[in-house]
Amino acid sequence: MSRRKFLQFGGAAAMTVLLPASGLLSGCSADQVTETLDNMGVKSGLDATFRGTREFTDSWGRTRTIPTVDKLERVYFTSALAQIFVFTLAPQLLGGTGMQFTPQELKYLPAGTENLVYMGSLSGGGEIDREMLLKQDIQLVIDCSGTTLSASDVSTAQKLEDQTGIPTLCIDGSFDNIRTAYQLLGEILGAEERAGKISEYLERVYNDVTAATAGIPDSEKVRLYYAEGPLGLQTEPDRGLHALTFDVAGANNVAAVEETQGIGMTNVSLETVLAWDPEVIIAWDDVIRGGADEIIRTDAKWSHISAVKNGRVYTMPNAPYAWCDRPPGVNRFLGIQWIANMLYPD
């Protein structure tokens, strides 16, 4: 079967309490039920369930008391990555937004997103409006990491929890763990069925693309340069957090540079890019992200590069999120398919 056949681009623990059918507890209030269970010697946490709370253990092993699914109405998040998880699982629970969207981006997002209160994000050293969190009656905060969850991630989330009193769950949302993250969040948000479908889709995309590109020798992989920033002279190294999409899609990322920790975007010179002579360039667009796609296509200084000479400079789709990197979430699985088809159309 051809690679193209494989790579056809397709688009884009709630606790249950079972009680006997007898009339033992019928007509009782929550307090009466709790008292009855206590008298029966039942100390398993069912009382918390009747009061609308339950215990949940996050990816770091922290156990927090959170609302039961039927009582959970307003959720917030510490980053755009965590917001994507909630967007794709249970958008009706969004208690605000950590991003300010353009009209073009809003076209692809759930109805009502434009009315969400902006409360900030902890990404990139930003801040969340603690007072607004309380004013908006946020019941739960989700923190998702783009890399393997670290003690620093947990410390930041714990600080927010200490300041607001709102339970904060830390979820490992790294690339290798993203399917598990969806399953956990589906459990938290009462969206297990949808989380299962998304997890299956992500696994299928990954398996199909990697199977279709696995047989390509390193010497035959297409040389790719990722042009970031307003001049196209910032990039991400092979295996860097913001370059994983290219690696999975089977590209030969030419950027032999050190990764800039945190935000990435390592500076390079045009002379270095000329020496790398990539066959394909993927650039930010100049309208939404202020990128250099048109500069690269039209500026004579870039004209000697193979990608430019052969008309293989491509603008990365950016709505509603960048398809290849930021935030490093489920959006990258669109990018994986797009890039693999573009590099290896046969």
Q: Model regions: which residues?
A:
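Bacterial Sec-exported substrate-binding components of ABC uptake systems
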Residues: 2-20, 28-84, 193-226, 342, ...
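Extracytoplasmic substrate-binding proteins
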Residues: 48, 53, 155-232, 317-346
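Short helix-initiation/N-cap motifs at beta->coil->alpha
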Residues: 61-62, 119-129, 259-270
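Ligand-binding pocket segment of bilobal, Venus flytrap-like solute-binding proteins
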Residues: 254-256, 263-290
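A short, structured surface patch at a secondary-structure boundary
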Residues: 81-136, 140-151, 254
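Short helices/loops that flank or line small-molecule/ion binding pockets
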Residues: 126-137, 184, 267-277
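Alpha-helical, coiled-coil/dimerization segments enriched in small aliphatic residues
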Residues: 239-264
